[in-house]
Amino acid sequence: MAKISITLKKSLIGRKKDHIATVNALGLKKIGRTVEHEDTPQIRGMIKKVDYLLEVK
């Protein structure tokens, strides 16, 4: 399966608690950090929920 790179581009300060939890579940803690995940429907759903905070390649 393909890999996707996810980078946190915006701060989590003042965001909804469930959005913060979703970003943390993706493995992102600080702005500018990048992680790689398998391209699965579960990961895509998490990305869609907080897409305004992320950059996906």
Swiss-Prot record:
Superkingdom in the source lineage: Bacteria
InterPro entries documented for this protein: Ribo_uL30_ferredoxin-like_sf, Ribosomal_uL30_bac-type, Ribosomal_uL30_ferredoxin-like
UniProt keyword list: Ribonucleoprotein, Ribosomal protein
Gene3D superfamilies listed in its UniProt record: Ribosomal protein L30, ferredoxin-like fold domain
Family note: Belongs to the universal ribosomal protein uL30 family.
Assembly mode: Part of the 50S ribosomal subunit.
Name this protein carries in UniProt: Large ribosomal subunit protein uL30
Organism this protein belongs to: Clostridium acetobutylicum (strain ATCC 824 / DSM 792 / JCM 1419 / IAM 19013 / LMG 5710 / NBRC 13948 / NRRL B-527 / VKM B-1787 / 2291 / W)
